[in-house]
């Protein structure tokens, strides 16, 4: 079964309480799932002979600060036998705890830790839910859209104290805004390589 629309309908029919939507974008099937039922969905995708999504590719999140459930937790899987990828999306709030997939796929360990570290998404049942990319005492989650661009503190090595020190961020100049729109030429200016483009 390689037809994505047919595969999406098959999965929706098998898991009607867990899968609310199936859509195809850019040649990839996307399922909208209930976050609380993610383990059930992924177990089906792994074990069902029509699916065989046996390889987790990534776990990440997308931040929509204007929504009540501000995060979309996103999982990507690959079925080598079908030569097909699938994307699972589930909404979560800052306090929603999403079940971990580590019992089904031990390889998602660092993916889930990264999503926790950078977005603050908490995965229940994960044996080692701690930061993986930022420093131990790091304040906040840097990929959230409300995190300041310059961060909260500056980390540097102090030669006098012979250790790493944390200081408030000092900006020596204001952020600059580069406006490339020419009032005379508009935005249709030639870019390098445009001469190779066929008309």
From Swiss-Prot:
E.C. designation(s): 7.1.1.-
Originating species: Rhodopseudomonas palustris (strain BisB18)
Main subcellular location: membrane
One GO cellular component term: plasma membrane
HAMAP family: NDH1_NuoC
Protein name as it appears in the record: NADH-quinone oxidoreductase subunit C
Catalysed reactions listed for this entry: a quinone + NADH + 5 H(+)(in) = a quinol + NAD(+) + 4 H(+)(out)
Lineage: Bacteria, Pseudomonadati, Pseudomonadota, Alphaproteobacteria, Hyphomicrobiales
Keyword field: Cell inner membrane, Cell membrane, Membrane, NAD, Quinone, Translocase, Transport, Ubiquinone
GO molecular function: NADH dehydrogenase (ubiquinone) activity; NADH:ubiquinone reductase (non-electrogenic) activity; quinone binding
Superkingdom of origin: Bacteria
Location of this chain's protein in the cell: Cell inner membrane
Membrane topology qualifier: Peripheral membrane protein
Complex formation: NDH-1 is composed of 14 different subunits. Subunits NuoB, C, D, E, F, and G constitute the peripheral sector of the complex.
Enzyme class name: translocase
UniProt-listed Pfam families: Complex1_30kDa
């Amino acid at each position: 079964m390689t037809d994505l629309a047919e595969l999406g309908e098959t999965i929706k029919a098998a898991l009607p309480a867990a899968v609310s939507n199936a859509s195809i974008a850019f040649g990839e099937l996307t399922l909208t799932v209930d976050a609380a039922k993610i383990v059930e969905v992924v177990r089906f995708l792994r074990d069902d002979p029509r699916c065989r999504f046996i390889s987790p590719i990534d776990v990440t999140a997308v931040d929509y600060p204007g929504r009540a459930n501000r995060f979309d937790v996103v999982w990507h899987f690959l079925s080598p036998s079908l030569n097909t990828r699938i994307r699972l999306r589930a909404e979560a709030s800052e306090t929603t705890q999403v079940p971990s997939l580590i019992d089904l796929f031990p390889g998602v360990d660092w993916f889930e830790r990264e999503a926790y570290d950078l977005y603050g998404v908490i995965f229940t049942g994960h044996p080692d839910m701690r930061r993986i990319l930022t420093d131990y005492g790091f304040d906040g989650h840097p990929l959230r859209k409300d995190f300041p661009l310059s961060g909260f503190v500056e980390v540097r090595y102090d030669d006098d104290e012979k250790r790493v020190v944390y200081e408030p961020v000092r900006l020596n100049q204001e952020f600059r805004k580069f406006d490339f729109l020419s009032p005379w030429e508009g935005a249709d200016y030639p870019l390098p390589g445009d001469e190779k483009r066929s008309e």
